């Protein structure tokens, strides 16, 4: 990997929010891509996940989720809401930087380490950022160099021979690949390998 795990999170936050800022004046109450959530609800989901992953690395529970829940103010204008996403990304990236390699924490998709939680956070930022961009009719694609480490870390059985972004979108049930139909159900594997 040519980018550090913390820089992956920071860059995913910056790239996705910069793309979404171009749609700040659009209707954020519409659905985010094929999700049932609105663009605003999806932002809160991203914040919840990314802040939660930082909290898991800090608290290090072995059998439960943490009790801190982060969200975006539903009344905040889009630029301020996106600032909240960048803050969440910075919190996770800083936590990844300061967490020792041997630390493990609970997650329902497998106890994980700092690299796993960084990849989970980047996935939330990138994939849901794309969902929102699609809902706002913005032209934005996940950069392959950000998708590749996420696929490598969270989807050990991912198909090979495709662009990393296409593979990530297939792994998360967003698209079909040649000879592989779109997935109806999916989950990542955060376990340490």
Indicate where each model-derived feature is located.
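Glycine-rich loop at the start of a catalytic domain that most often binds anionic cofactors/ligands
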Residues: 45-46
